[in-house]
């Protein structure tokens, strides 16, 4: 687990953009979190009962590329001070998904009614952070240009299993010119806690993708003649694994509605 | 120019493997330098009269990926102490090529008879160094497996010209599985003074390569169905540029017969 300390939050100091974004999410005023609080890390959420949390933690430990943990709570504690002093995991995402036995049973804007003393929250790094670094280097991000969701694919790359958690790695795809793909490997290698370097490029069929035009999640994007598809491990992997495990109880974020933290993306760079 | 200091050479100390290799070359006992003194940097050689050396130096400065200078001499001085205290550039390569007006006129085992007070020697990093790092990471190098020369191609990537020196970048190609190609980008990015990260991967036609099975220099190698071609800037570029410039006088190394230096490959790693 990456241990990072966020700047402190104090009522007397100017409000951080991330805190303002989180307060807006808490108040139910966010339709999506993409674009909120630029420069700040957003994360995927997975909440599990303590009796499953150890297995899930081990799953993440063994599969750090799709499941990089950037913060987690104590058992039963809805706070994660390392990601924001005021942060309350029960209220600070715009929308949640509540799962029972592998079925989504509720999609509430807070989980006060679902919180239990045995729950553990995991916050997992997301590609927004490395996309910001790619764009800062003026690399084009096709799905952002086209205004659609990133295309994602189930692969034939098996995650290392842990307890009930097992399944294939899900990857996101961004088409790039070869020289930009090389640059993207360099840039994203600096960000191991938000999926890091690509896991694959070119040759979609080598990782079990039969039709690049038909993603399993998200939307298809154009791949130009002078571009190759570049694949990164994706934070949808743990969500798919939790759903496939049909565990008695779990809570996740609703797609596109992430947790905004007080960590800055640049803090995640290892170099 | 990368400034590095080689370990000192003293008659009293145990002889470095690089010094032993250089003495063997000096005595004319080396048929090739590949495999000599493992761990030590080998370099391409280009020697030009002072009135052309400034332009050539500027060419290298502007094209650091194909022409990374790892050492150069003072005008008229055959020593390059930073690469080896005892090193004599006139005798320490197994074989040289002497060029007049763009034609090779001699291929001697030393250049004592050709040395002049106005000559400047440039030693340029070579791919042996990064191939050693790739193999240390257990990545396969196809031309080494097949026992042939690395395939090299003229591209449509124009070098930045300087004085009479101009022309396309020449690249070397190594086929790799996509995940190994990503790893190779990371590894070779650590070695900017020996060509650094690849300049291209996949899509040979994008850089003007019409038939990957017909290299312009070296030998063809097998590319398996699950591999992509990965292209690095190549030290043949400055040699091709010197030949194309048809300069009145130049000396280079003979292909495959490089200068063995006292620098260690691991010293060249920036991380």
UniProtKB/Swiss-Prot annotation, chains A, B:
EC number assigned by the record: 4.2.1.-
Keyword Lyase: yes
Lyase recorded as keyword: yes
Pfam family for this entry, one: D-Glu_cyclase
Keywords (A to Z) from UniProt: Lyase
Broad enzyme group: lyase
InterPro entries from the UniProt entry: D-Glu_cyclase, Putative_hydro-lyase, UPF0317
Molecular function terms from GO: lyase activity
Family that this chain belongs to: Belongs to the D-glutamate cyclase family.
Annotated protein name in UniProt: Putative hydro-lyase RPC_1666
């Amino acid at each position: 687990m990456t241990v990072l300390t966020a700047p402190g939050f104090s009522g007397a100091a100017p409000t951080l953009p991330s805190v303002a974004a989180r307060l807006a999410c808490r108040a139910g005023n966010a339709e999506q979190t993409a674009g909120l609080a630029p420069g700040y890390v957003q994360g995927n959420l997975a909440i599990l009962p303590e009796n499953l949390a150890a297995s899930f933690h081990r799953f993440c430990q063994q599969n750090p590329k799709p499941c990089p943990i950037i913060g987690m709570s104590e058992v039963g504690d809805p706070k994660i001070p390392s990601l924001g002093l005021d942060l309350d995991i029960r209220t600070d995402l715009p929308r949640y998904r509540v799962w029972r036995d592998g079925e989504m049973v509720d999609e509430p804007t807070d989980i006060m009614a679902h919180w239990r003393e045995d729950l553990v929250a995991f916050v997992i790094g997301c590609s927004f952070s490395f996309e910001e670094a790619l764009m800062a280097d003026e690399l084009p991000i096709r799905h952002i240009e086209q205004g659609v969701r990133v295309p994602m694919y189930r692969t034939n790359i098996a995650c290392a299993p842990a307890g009930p958690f097992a399944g294939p790695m899900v990857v996101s795809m961004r088409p790039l010119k070869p020289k930009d793909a090389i640059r993207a490997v360099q840039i994203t290698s600096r960000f191991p806690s938000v999926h890091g370097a690509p896991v694959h490029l070119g040759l979609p069929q080598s990782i079990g993708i039969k039709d690049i035009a038909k993603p399993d999640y998200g939307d298809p994007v154009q791949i130009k003649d002078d571009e190759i598809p570049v694949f990164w491990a994706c934070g949808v992997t743990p969500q798919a694994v939790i759903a496939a495990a049909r565990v008695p109880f779990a809570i996740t974020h609703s797609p596109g509605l992430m947790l905004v933290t007080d960590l800055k993306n640049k803090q995640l760079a290892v170099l």
